[in-house]
């Protein structure tokens, strides 16, 4: 028995497209308008700062000689496939989980595109307090973190709310 895509979690794939457009658009603007290492202050505690990340979160394995590019690309593809299957198997009415999965897929694909096209991930958001700076990140990273937080949140909701949220 075949399911209509609109009756499955794949109905929420538009979120993936939105994340990709916003993420890749922001990275394009940075690449076109910033020199590597350039910083522009937006607000107190928030800068735009063009950085290249050859590793994963917090530049994990960034200095590993290049193999990590393909390793992290493979992980991204695997995660996207698993989450797309989960979306297909879930009902479209399971909004919270499906939106979370779509945010993670969109973020993973945004960073995957960077890895494959540029050989590095473009980062640009620099949050700081005083002299302490958080790791520079991008909108794809934000989408992944928000998606993961939504999955954790869903785990704390009562089961009656999970069916409709």
Swiss-Prot record:
<feature type="transmembrane region" description="Helical">
    <location>
        <begin position="137"/>
        <end position="157"/>
    </location>
</feature>
<keyword id="KW-0997">Cell inner membrane</keyword>
<feature type="transmembrane region" description="Helical">
    <location>
        <begin position="12"/>
        <end position="32"/>
    </location>
</feature>
<feature type="transmembrane region" description="Helical">
    <location>
        <begin position="102"/>
        <end position="122"/>
    </location>
</feature>
<keyword id="KW-0378">Hydrolase</keyword>
<dbReference type="GO" id="GO:0006508">
    <property type="term" value="P:proteolysis"/>
</dbReference>
<dbReference type="InterPro" id="IPR001872">
    <property type="entry name" value="Peptidase_A8"/>
</dbReference>
<keyword id="KW-1133">Transmembrane helix</keyword>
<comment type="similarity">
    <text>Belongs to the peptidase A8 family.</text>
</comment>
<comment type="pathway">
    <text>Protein modification; lipoprotein biosynthesis (signal peptide cleavage).</text>
</comment>
<dbReference type="GO" id="GO:0005886">
    <property type="term" value="C:plasma membrane"/>
</dbReference>
<dbReference type="Pfam" id="PF01252">
    <property type="entry name" value="Peptidase_A8"/>
</dbReference>
<feature type="transmembrane region" description="Helical">
    <location>
        <begin position="70"/>
        <end position="90"/>
    </location>
</feature>
<dbReference type="GO" id="GO:0004190">
    <property type="term" value="F:aspartic-type endopeptidase activity"/>
</dbReference>
<comment type="function">
    <text>This protein specifically catalyzes the removal of signal peptides from prolipoproteins.</text>
</comment>
<keyword id="KW-0645">Protease</keyword>
<keyword id="KW-0812">Transmembrane</keyword>
<feature type="active site">
    <location>
        <position position="123"/>
    </location>
</feature>
<protein>
    <recommendedName>
        <fullName>Lipoprotein signal peptidase</fullName>
        <ecNumber>3.4.23.36</ecNumber>
    </recommendedName>
</protein>
<keyword id="KW-1003">Cell membrane</keyword>
<feature type="active site">
    <location>
        <position position="141"/>
    </location>
</feature>
<keyword id="KW-0064">Aspartyl protease</keyword>
<keyword id="KW-0472">Membrane</keyword>
């Amino acid at each position: 028995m075949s399911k209509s895509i609109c009756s499955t979690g794949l109905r929420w794939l538009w979120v993936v497209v939105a994340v990709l457009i916003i993420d890749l658009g922001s990275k394009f603007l940075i690449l076109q308008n910033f020199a590597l290492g350039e910083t522009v202050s937006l607000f107190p505690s928030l800068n735009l700062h063009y950085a290249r990340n050859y590793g994963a979160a917090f530049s994990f394995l960034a200095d590993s000689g290049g193999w990590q590019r393909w390793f992290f690309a493979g992980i991204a593809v695997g995660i996207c496939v698993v989450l797309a299957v989960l979306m297909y198997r879930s009902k479209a009415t399971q909004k919270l989980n499906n939106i979370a999965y779509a945010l993670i897929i969109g973020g993973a694909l945004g960073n995957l595109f960077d890895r494959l096209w540029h050989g590095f991930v473009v980062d640009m958001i620099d949050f700081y307090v005083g002299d302490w700076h958080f790791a520079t990140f991008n909108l794809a990273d934000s989408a992944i973190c928000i998606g993961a937080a939504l999955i954790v949140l869903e785990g704390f909701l009562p089961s009656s709310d999970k069916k409709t949220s």
